[in-house]
Structures are given as structure tokens and as C-alpha cells.
């Protein structure tokens, strides 16, 4: 199992949590972004900077991801694409996306986008907080404990 990080929107507060997991479990990690992003220094981490563009990082992740890999992203359409390749996806708030729930999240995302575009609602998601970081850490550790054993 490899770990891919959609690096452009990855919260700084999660970097130490992620780095500890990478080191502890000896995971191969790819941080894919449109600009330089640093999680930490390690031989296990590869930083891949792609061209500027709306879906360049997403497309690169989808191209590289394989069955069983884990992608960390807040981008629901990207999560849908990697799940269709039998990979896994978790967001920054600890939500584990699966074949059972991704279509629901995608439909809700698309509905909210239409509502915002119509001007009826203008605010986006609530600010990232410590509770979110804690939920992410718990979900990541739970997922890794369950899936690293299979390797």
C-alpha cells in the first residue's frame, strides 16, 4: 500500500500527525501538488510538483494510484475517481470514503455547488479545527492498522 496526498489543500496542522504515521509504518508516500508543499524530510516521501491547472494534481494522482492505495484529499470528485480504481480515500476531517458512500457525498457536493452558484448560499465548509485533526488522526490510524496487516 502506498499513500498519496493531494498536497495543495492539505492542512498544516495535520502534517506532524501524518509524518509520524509515515515514519512509524515505513510507508511510501507521494505528495502531489501544483506548488512546493512539505510534510517533512524522509526518504519515504516523494514530492511531485505538477503543472498549474484545475485538475493537474488530481489527474496525476489518478494516473499513479493502484488498488489498495490510500489517497488523502478533501476533493470529493478525486475521491470518487480513486475509489473507482479500487483504492481508498480519506478526507482531512477523517471521513473515509468508500464505494458505499462516495456517490452520496458526490451528489451532496454537486447540489451544494449549484445552490452556491445560484446565490442562495455563499458560505463554504466550516473552518478546520482541533476536533477535525483528532478525527483525522483516529481514522487514519484505524485505517492503517486494518490495512497494513494485510500487506
Curated annotation (Swiss-Prot):
InterPro entries: UPF0178 (IPR003791). Disulfide bonds: none annotated. Belongs to the UPF0178 family. NCBIfam families: PRK00124.1 (NF001095). This is UPF0178 protein Suden_0449.
Amino acid at each position: 500500500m502506498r499513500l498519496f496526498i493531494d498536497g495543495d489543500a492539505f492542512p498544516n496542522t495535520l502534517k506532524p500527525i501524518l509524518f509520524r504515521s509515515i515514519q512509524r509504518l515505513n510507508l511510501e508516500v507521494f505528495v502531489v501538488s501544483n506548488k512546493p508543499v512539505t510534510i517533512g524530510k524522509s526518504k519515504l516521501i516523494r514530492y511531485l510538483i505538477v503543472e498549474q491547472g484545475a485538475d493537474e494534481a488530481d489527474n496525476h494522482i489518478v494516473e499513479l494510484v493502484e488498488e489498495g492505495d490510500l489517497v488523502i484529499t478533501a476533493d470529493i470528485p478525486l475521491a470518487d475517481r480513486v475509489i473507482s480504481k479500487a483504492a481508498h480515500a480519506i478526507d482531512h476531517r477523517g471521513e473515509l470514503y468508500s464505494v458505499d458512500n462516495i456517490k452520496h457525498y458526490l451528489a451532496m457536493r454537486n447540489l451544494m455547488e449549484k445552490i452556491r452558484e445560484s446565490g442562495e448560499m455563499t458560505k463554504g465548509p466550516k473552518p478546520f479545527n482541533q476536533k477535525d485533526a483528532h478525527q483525522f488522526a483516529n481514522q487514519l490510524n484505524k485505517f492503517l492498522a486494518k490495512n497494513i496487516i494485510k500487506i
